[in-house]
Amino acid sequence: MSVDKETVAKIASLARIKMTDAELEKMAPELSNILDWVEQLGEVDTSDVEPMTAVIPNTLRLREDEVNADPLTGGGVRDKVLANAPAAEHGFFGVPKVIE
């Protein structure tokens, strides 16, 4: 897949990354090579491969969930923490919108 300078500029703009023309020129072939490699991965026959989430099996010991389980604070400090935030809504931190 071929990526041109304008495509790199658009991606950089969406990611809020400032790039010079020289950086855009350098990045276009690099992104093209990465996407070509991803296309090659898509061509690999994986029909006989068992799906997995990790190479090494993950066996984690589980515990019961406990409300207010924080040993340092005893829990129940959400309101105190949110009181220091510039914006909060429905028990969550409020942040400015960054997606256009």
UniProtKB/Swiss-Prot annotation:
SUPFAM superfamilies: Glu-tRNAGln amidotransferase C subunit. Gene3D superfamilies: Glu-tRNAGln amidotransferase C subunit, N-terminal domain. One of its GO terms (biological process) is translation. Keywords: ATP-binding, Ligase, Nucleotide-binding, Protein biosynthesis. Heterotrimer of A, B and C subunits. Allows the formation of correctly charged Asn-tRNA(Asn) or Gln-tRNA(Gln) through the transamidation of misacylated Asp-tRNA(Asn) or Glu-tRNA(Gln) in organisms which lack either or both of asparaginyl-tRNA or glutaminyl-tRNA synthetases. The reaction takes place in the presence of glutamine and ATP through an activated phospho-Asp-tRNA(Asn) or phospho-Glu-tRNA(Gln). This is Aspartyl/glutamyl-tRNA(Asn/Gln) amidotransferase subunit C. The gene is gatC.
